[in-house]
Amino acid sequence: MNRKGRRKTEKVYVKVNSDFDATGYMQPRQITWGDGRTYPIEQVRDFRPANTIADMPGDCYTVMIKGQERYLFFERSDPRFPSRFGRWFVEVETK
């Protein structure tokens, strides 16, 4: 644990297939890890600014994967690079 009492984690960037609805809402559908493992997202249970969960800018989706609740983060890109909208990551516990 770190000084704030939180478990030590690191960002692991993942590929996420998403849909956008007519209002512009981004709905993540599937996660693919770097080694090729793919997991469908069964349900999006919540969506909020990430700083309500962790001290970071961006968005946090609470999703169900294989019956377990997980956090999936969307990190917005620097506005100086308009062709890059952002990227997805999960937090993985470290020792």
Where are these regions (language model features)?
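Cysteine-centric segments in proteins
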Residues: M1-K95
